[in-house]
Every structure is written in C-alpha cells, then in structure tokens.
C-alpha cells in the first residue's frame, strides 16, 4: 500500500459526500490532495435515511448502481391521520444506497488525482507558520503530514474544527437522535412517495418511510426525548396510523446516527482551515437533510482551497470567499428552517391536527408564509406561533 507523503497542498478529513466533493474539486483544480477516512470501507456505517435531491445539478449522473428509488413527493401525516400531499421542489429526488453512493463519490475524487487513506484516523493537528501538521494513524502506522489547507469534513462528531479553535455545535439539544430499520414486506401508500409522521409519537422530530427499491427505510429522529429513538420507533411499527402496513415487515439492517439541527456554526474558516458538511452544521434544522447541501458546499470548499494554493495565500481573509459563497446561497434558508423547526416543536397533537385541517390536501410547493395565513384564518388560536411569519 502506498505510504503517505510528507506534505500536501490540501488534506481533507472525512470521506462522506462533503469530503469527497471537496477533495474532488481541489484535485480537479490542481491541488495535491489527501482524503482521510477513519472507516475501513467508505460509506459505512450508514447513518441516514439516504434521501438525496436531484444530484445532476452537482455534476453527478444518477447511476443505477446506487439509485434505489425515484421520489416525486411526500405525504405529511398528522396525528389524526390527515394526509397532506407535497410534490415537486425539495421533495423531488432519489433514495440511494449510501454504501455505494459514498464510495462512488470517493472513486470519482480518486480519479481526479486525490490520494485516499482509508482506516486512518487524525489524532491531532498542530498549527505551523504556513499551515498544519496533521497527525495520522494510517493502517496502524503513525505519520505527520504537512498541509497548507485542512478541510474538516469529519461529520457531526467533528474534532478537527475544535482542534483548530473553531466552535462546533455539540449541545445534545441541538442533535437529533436517529434510528432506522431497512425493512422488506412494507406496504407503502405510494412507491414513489415518502411518508412523514409527526406528533407525540416522535417528540420534536418525525418518523419517515422512504421507498428503497425492494426495501423501505423506516426511521425516526427525536430531540431531547425521554426515551431512546429506537423505543419510539418500535412502538410506531404497530401504530394505527400505518393501518397494519408494517405487520409483516422484516428488518434486514439497523442504523443509528445523529443530525446537527441547531443551524450552521458561526465561523467556518480560519487561517489554513475550512469546515464543511455536518461538521459545519450544513443540515436543514427542519428536515435533518443535508446531503445535497453538503455536496454543494464541498464543491465550494475544494475550489476555494485550490484557488488559495495557486495564490499562495492561505489566510482567513482569502478562505472567507468559501464562507461568503455558501452563506449567500444557504444561510437564509437554513435560518428560516431553524425558525420553522422551533415553531413545530412547540405544537401539540391537537394543534398539528388543526394545521393539517387548515391547509390544502395537495401542495405543489411549500410556502410557509402563505400557509401561515391560511392556518391562522381557520385556527386563530395558532396566531401566537405564526405571527412572526405573517
């Protein structure tokens, strides 16, 4: 196996979608790049529901090797069973096999020139005059690698950002605890539609059913709950809301994970370092989804890193071009989602039912401001929650 070099232009820590896209774009634009992944197999363990937006906009073809289902929309299901159908917009996309998808993105990065080190752990970083010393345990051997730029794409449990003095969000009340079964013998309402359930059955979160070819991802995300996520999920399997459609379901895989849903971190760059993906809070606080966002921000991070190498300028001032780009595109939507999440978490089952009864059964796109007007018109008691949206 090829040993690590003494130095690189860019070292990316974490080979999830954000890290692989960042390393791909850095290499593509001429930077000597190393991608470090702690798992022995990229894409494992899977920790998410595997829904992604239309990936074509990121230059990725929807290859049959990882696309399991095409998604055209979703059902939002209130505690009383009222269904609201949402189609198009953010609900249009795919369910992928993350084990294959993540590896596909890493292979693409490797083909662009990135050196990849699997089963490798960064044990620390040390600031130098012109970058960082990165301490790596690579297949059991210890290395010290010099890098002009470090890209921290090491997920919700990010240590790299903290090593560099950048504050990451690890408040338990800002982490959504998730559990999921991949199951066969599940009867869906529609094989091209996702299902979302809300209320006391999943405190401050939601339950999802995502079609995945011959199987279905049945999962839950909860925040600051009294019981474990898996306990709520097991109770849901026999809930009348699913009308016996899970009675014969058989699990073939179990997954757990955490989503940072407190919004983006305040600062995502400093001298010689960039933070991206879950490590940066590049996740919708409302839905917990972040693969597409992380991929796009990864592309931005890799491009700016390569530009800084060409300019021989690795300062916070130069790297702030990355922060400016991602914030211009995503900061306001993320903060809106944070506001919507905070409202949703305060609603009782009766109030959720009132909302479902107040809005049309079919929506082409969700405009929260317009929906708030309709909700308050039919349920004035909810004004205290929605007045800031009117």
From Swiss-Prot:
Q: Copy the pathway line from the protein's UniProt record.
A: Membrane lipid metabolism; glycerophospholipid metabolism
Q: Which cofactor does it need?
A: FAD
Q: Reaction catalysed?
A: a 2,3-bis-O-phytanyl-sn-glycerol 1-phospholipid + 8 A = a 2,3-bis-O-(geranylgeranyl)-sn-glycerol 1-phospholipid + 8 AH2; 2,3-bis-O-(phytanyl)-sn-glycerol 1-phosphate + 8 A = 2,3-bis-O-(geranylgeranyl)-sn-glycerol 1-phosphate + 8 AH2; CDP-2,3-bis-O-(geranylgeranyl)-sn-glycerol + 8 AH2 = CDP-2,3-bis-O-(phytanyl)-sn-glycerol + 8 A; archaetidylserine + 8 AH2 = 2,3-bis-O-phytanyl-sn-glycero-3-phospho-L-serine + 8 A
Which Pfam family, any one, appears in the UniProt record?
FAD_oxidored
Q: Where does FAD bind?
A: 18, 37, 48-49, 51, 98, 122, 278, 290-291
Q: Which UniProt keywords apply?
A: FAD, Flavoprotein, Lipid biosynthesis, Lipid metabolism, Oxidoreductase, Phospholipid biosynthesis, Phospholipid metabolism
Q: How is the cofactor bound?
A: Binds 1 FAD per subunit.
Which Gene Ontology cellular component terms are annotated? membrane
In terms of InterPro entries, this protein maps to: DGGGPL_reductase, FAD/NAD-bd_sf, Geranylgeranyl_Rdtase_fam, Geranylgeranyl_reductase, GGR_cat
Provide the E.C. number(s) assigned to this enzyme: 1.3.-.-
Q: Does the keyword Methyltransferase apply?
A: no
Q: What else is known?
A: Reduction reaction proceeds via syn addition of hydrogen for double bonds.
Molecular-function annotations in GO:
flavin adenine dinucleotide binding; geranylgeranyl reductase activity; oxidoreductase activity, acting on the CH-CH group of donors, NAD or NADP as acceptor
Q: Does the keyword Nucleotide-binding apply?
A: no
Q: What is this protein called?
A: Digeranylgeranylglycerophospholipid reductase
- Alphabetical list of SUPFAM superfamilies matching this protein: FAD/NAD(P)-binding domain
The record's family statement is:
Belongs to the geranylgeranyl reductase family. DGGGPL reductase subfamily.
| Family annotation (HAMAP family) | DGGGPL_reductase
Gene Ontology biological process terms, A to Z: glycerophospholipid biosynthetic process; membrane lipid biosynthetic process
Q: Where does a 2,3-bis-O-(geranylgeranyl)-sn-glycerol 1-phospholipid bind?
A: 368
